């Protein structure tokens, strides 16, 4: 899980984005949950949910969808101007809002809400 957070952080940085600390902590809990849980694959074989999700592909999609959530959040805020930091920062809320649809799309169960508690 720690390595996947590092990969997500590097991917985001290459895209001129950054995760706030709470977002990184939530991702670490999410990846740990997926690594510890199992799900049957297309052949009915039990595999780690993280492997079913596709590790690197899942991380890339999480970064991209979290950026989309950030853009939506900023577009729908009452603020007229944003700092560069605000434009670059992906919050825990952005990450959390991107997770459930992504997991459902992969046929995986959404983890219990305690993974996103701070």
Predicted regions mapped to residue ranges:
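Short, structured motif recognition centered on aromatic/hydrophobic residues
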Residues: 5-8, 59-67
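Residue-identity detector for glycine
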Residues: 44, 54-56, 105-107
């Amino acid at each position: 899980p720690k390595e996947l957070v590092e990969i997500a952080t590097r991917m985001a940085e290459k895209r001129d984005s950054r995760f706030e600390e709470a977002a990184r902590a939530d991702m670490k809990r999410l990846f740990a949950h997926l690594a510890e849980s199992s799900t049957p694959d297309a052949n009915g074989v039990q595999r780690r949910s993280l492997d079913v999700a596709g590790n690197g592909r899942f991380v890339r999609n999480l970064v991209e969808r979290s950026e989309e959530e950030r853009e939506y959040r900023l577009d729908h805020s009452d603020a007229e101007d944003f700092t560069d930091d605000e434009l670059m920062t992906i919050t825990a809320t952005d990450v959390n809002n991107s997770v459930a649809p992504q997991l459902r799309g992969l046929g995986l169960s959404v983890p219990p809400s305690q993974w996103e508690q701070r």
